[in-house]
Design a protein with these regions (language model features):
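Membrane-cytosol interface segments of multi-pass membrane proteins
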Residues: 1-167, 302-339
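Hydrophobic residues within membrane-embedded alpha-helical segments of Major Facilitator Superfamily
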Residues: 14, 21-24, 59-61, 196, ...
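Aromatic-anchored segments of alpha-helical transmembrane domains
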Residues: 20-27, 91-97, 158-173, 220-235, ...
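Juxtamembrane "helix-exit" motif on the non-cytosolic side of transmembrane helices
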Residues: 31-36, 100-105, 169-179, 228-241, ...
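Specific transmembrane alpha-helix
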Residues: 54-72, 127-143, 170-211, 249-269, ...
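Membrane-interface helix caps and helix-loop-helix hairpins in membrane proteins
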Residues: 117-125, 173-186, 236-244, 304
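Alpha-helical transmembrane segments and terminal signal-anchor/GPI-anchor hydrophobic tails
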Residues: 190-193, 208-275, 301, 306
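Helix-helix packing/entry segments at the starts of transmembrane helices
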Residues: 274-292
C-alpha cells in the first residue's frame, strides 16, 4: 500500500503522453500519403505535428531506463517479461481475427499462427520484438552502468552512444550534389534503444532539473529545425524528404524527447489527476497494441479532423485494454499457476 501511495505521477504522465503521440504518428500516416504537396497549410501543420510526435518511442525508452536502472540479475527477473508476452499473444490473435473479418488481410490457419510468432500479426508489434530483447539485457546494462561508477564515466558512455546511434541520421540528411554526407559510421544506428535507455538511467540517477522558461524554446527548436528542413527539401516532384531527420534514431528527435522528459518526470499532479493518469498508464502497453485494429477499423470507415480521430482511437484502445486486463489476463494467469 505504501508503494502505491509513493508512486510518482510524472512517469505516468510521460507514458500516457507517449501513447497519445504514437497514435498521432499513425493517424497522420492514415490520413493521406506523405508524397502529397506538403507545402499546403494543412500538411505543413501535419508535418510539424509529426516531428513532435516522433518523440513517442524515445519517451518510452527513456522511461524504461529511468524506472529499471536498479533491476538486478536475480531469481524471478526473467518471469517479469511474461505479462508483456501474454498481452502480446492475446492482442495478436485478436488482430488476426480483426484483419480477416475486415478484409484487410486474408490469413489461413498456418499463416495466422506464424504471423503471431514472427510479430507481423499486429502492425505495431515491432516495438514488442524490440522491447523483449531490451528487457533481457537490462540486468547486464545495469551492471555496466553501476560499475562505471562516476558521473563523468556514465556521461561519456551516453555521449558515445548518441554519436554512434543518433548523430549519423542527422548528418546523412544533408546532401551535396545529391550525395548524402555519410561521413559518420552508421552501422550502430539501429542500437538507438541503448542510448535512450542509458540517458533515462542517468536522469533517474542524478535527477537533473530543467528551468521551465528554457524548456519550451528548446523543444520548439528541436521540432522546428527538422520539420523546417524537411519542408524545404520536399517537393511535389521529388516527394516527401524521408531522408531528412525522419525517425527515432536522430539527434533532434532525441533532444526533443529528453527535453519533454525533463519537464514532466518530476511533476506531481493533484491526486484525482494522478489517479486518472495512473489508470491510463497501467493500460498503455495494451492500448498501444489495440490501437492497430482500432486504426484499421476507424480509418477504413471514415476520416475526420485528426485530433478527433486520435482521441477516438485512444478511447477505443483503452476500452479494449481495460476489458482484457479485467477478464482475459487473470484467466490466463490462473491457468499458468494451475489454479
Amino acid at each position: 500500500m505504501n508503494n502505491f501511495k509513493k508512486r510518482a505521477g510524472g512517469p505516468d504522465i510521460i507514458r500516457v503522453l507517449a501513447t497519445l503521440l504514437v497514435m498521432t504518428t499513425h493517424s497522420i500516416a492514415y490520413l493521406g500519403p506523405m508524397n502529397v504537396d506538403i507545402h499546403t497549410p494543412k500538411w505543413t501543420a501535419y508535418l510539424v505535428v509529426r516531428f513532435a510526435a516522433l518523440s513517442c518511442v524515445p519517451l518510452f525508452l527513456l522511461l524504461t531506463g529511468y524506472l529499471n536502472r536498479k533491476k538486478k540479475l536475480e531469481k524471478g527477473y526473467f518471469r517479469g517479461i511474461l505479462p508483456v508476452v501474454i498481452s502480446y499473444l492475446i492482442i495478436a490473435a485478436f488482430s488476426v481475427i480483426c484483419t480477416n473479418i475486415g478484409g484487410h488481410t486474408a490469413f489461413g490457419v498456418a499463416d495466422s499462427i506464424r504471423s503471431v510468432f514472427d510479430f507481423t500479426a499486429n502492425g505495431y508489434a515491432w516495438y514488442v520484438e524490440m522491447y523483449i530483447g531490451l528487457y533481457l539485457l537490462i540486468p547486464f546494462l545495469n551492471i555496466l552502468f553501476e560499475h562505471l561508477g562516476t558521473f563523468r564515466n556514465r556521461m561519456l558512455l551516453c555521449i558515445i552512444l548518441v554519436c554512434m546511434t543518433m548523430l549519423p541520421a542527422a548528418v546523412e540528411s544533408f546532401r551535396v550534389g545529391g550525395v548524402a554526407l555519410d561521413i559518420i559510421p552508421e552501422y550502430w544506428e539501429a542500437a538507438y534503444p541503448l542510448g535512450y535507455y542509458f540517458i533515462g538511467a542517468m536522469i533517474g540517477e542524478y535527477q537533473p532539473k530543467i528551468k521551465k522558461r528554457y524548456s519550451i524554446p528548446m523543444a520548439l527548436i528541436a521540432i522546428l529545425i527538422p520539420s523546417g528542413l524537411c519542408w524545404l527539401y520536399s517537393s511535389p516532384e521529388a516527394g516527401y524528404a524521408w531522408y531528412m531527420m525522419n525517425g527515432f534514431s536522430c539527434i533532434t528527435t532525441g533532444a526533443m524527447a529528453v527535453t519533454i522528459f525533463l519537464v514532466l518526470y518530476d511533476i506531481e499532479p493533484p491526486k484525482p489527476v494522478a489517479a486518472v493518469f495512473r489508470e491510463l498508464s497501467t493500460c498503455s502497453f495494451e492500448m498501444y497494441l489495440f490501437s492497430y485494429p482500432a486504426d484499421l477499423f476507424l480509418y477504413s470507415q471514415t476520416s475526420y479532423f485528426m485530433p478527433f480521430m486520435v482521441l477516438t482511437v485512444f478511447a477505443m484502445s483503452y476500452a479494449a485494454a481495460r476489458v482484457m486486463r479485467l477478464v482475459m489476463v487473470p484467466l490466463v494467469y490462473r491457468r499458468l499457476k494451475g489454479r
